[in-house]
Amino acid sequence: MENMNVFQLNIGLNNNPYTFEKITEALVVTFEGEIVGTREHMGEYEGRPEPTLVAKIVTEMDSESLRVFTTMMAMKFTQECIGMKVNEEGTLVYNPDFKGEQYTFDAEYFIEF
């Protein structure tokens, strides 16, 4: 189990055409690792409450591959952005179609698993 990365995601459920269960299924299929768990948490986006899927995945995939997959998920799940952490490094991955102001990752707003 060398070279394993702990990958965490925050995926908003408002404006998302997929349910919590369907997103969890998509994560199982997408990632070449084991989903340690998913849970729903009431988060916040732009000052408004938003139910959020919080996922923790253990995977051999590298950071760049995880970023590419997260970009694809932002598009599939109609998200402006998805917060992600690989080990202790966090970032916001924006949907390429999003034209608004892009923020930088702030650990204070990231929901840990």
Which sequence ranges carry the predicted segments?
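Short, low-order "capping/linker" segments at domain edges
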Residues: R48-T52, T91-F113
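Short, intrinsically disordered low-complexity segments
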Residues: T30-M72, K76
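Generic low-polarity alpha-helical segments
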Residues: I23, T70, I82-G83
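N-terminal, charge-rich interaction modules
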Residues: M1-V36, E44-E46, F113
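Conserved short beta-strand edge segments in small beta-sheet-based binding/regulatory domains
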Residues: E34-V36, K76-G90
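Polar/charged alpha-helical tracts
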Residues: E21, E25, E64-R67, E89, ...
